[in-house]
Amino acid sequence: MFLLYEYDIFWAFLIISSVIPILAFLISGLLSPIRKGPEKLSSYESGIEPMGDAWLQFRIRYYMFALVFVVFDVETVFLYPWAMSFDVLGVSVFIEALIFVLILIVGLVYAWRKGALEWS
């Protein structure tokens, strides 16, 4: 029989982990001083007055490099635990990791062919 009372701890942690950040934002919003002045409204650039406009438009090339970096950085995060427990896991996990790496290599080749890795 399916018993819902076994999930009481889960619901308690869910409620507590939701309430704590909300309370932190509310309390900091209530206790923080609200003063608007020219220093508060100016943009900050290494402790000196900004040179030029603070809003610069970046080329899409930067975003493409960042996106490719994030994809392969996440790949490393997923492959590290697998590499640390490689001797304990079986052949099926090795095949799954191999398929995962092959899918990422296909994505890298696709990005390379589309010119996402060229800086010109």
Swiss-Prot record:
Complex formation: NDH is composed of at least 16 different subunits, 5 of which are encoded in the nucleus.
Protein localization: Plastid, Chloroplast thylakoid membrane
Catalysis performed (reactions): a plastoquinone + NADH + (n+1) H(+)(in) = a plastoquinol + NAD(+) + n H(+)(out); a plastoquinone + NADPH + (n+1) H(+)(in) = a plastoquinol + NADP(+) + n H(+)(out)
Gene: ndhC
Gene3D superfamilies, sorted: NADH:ubiquinone/plastoquinone oxidoreductase, chain 3
Protein name: NAD(P)H-quinone oxidoreductase subunit 3, chloroplastic
GO biological process: photosynthesis, light reaction
Function, in words: NDH shuttles electrons from NAD(P)H:plastoquinone, via FMN and iron-sulfur (Fe-S) centers, to quinones in the photosynthetic chain and possibly in a chloroplast respiratory chain. The immediate electron acceptor for the enzyme in this species is believed to be plastoquinone. Couples the redox reaction to proton translocation, and thus conserves the redox energy in a proton gradient.
This enzyme's EC code(s): 7.1.1.-
Any one GO cellular component localisation term in the record: chloroplast thylakoid membrane
Protein family according to the UniProt entry: Belongs to the complex I subunit 3 family.
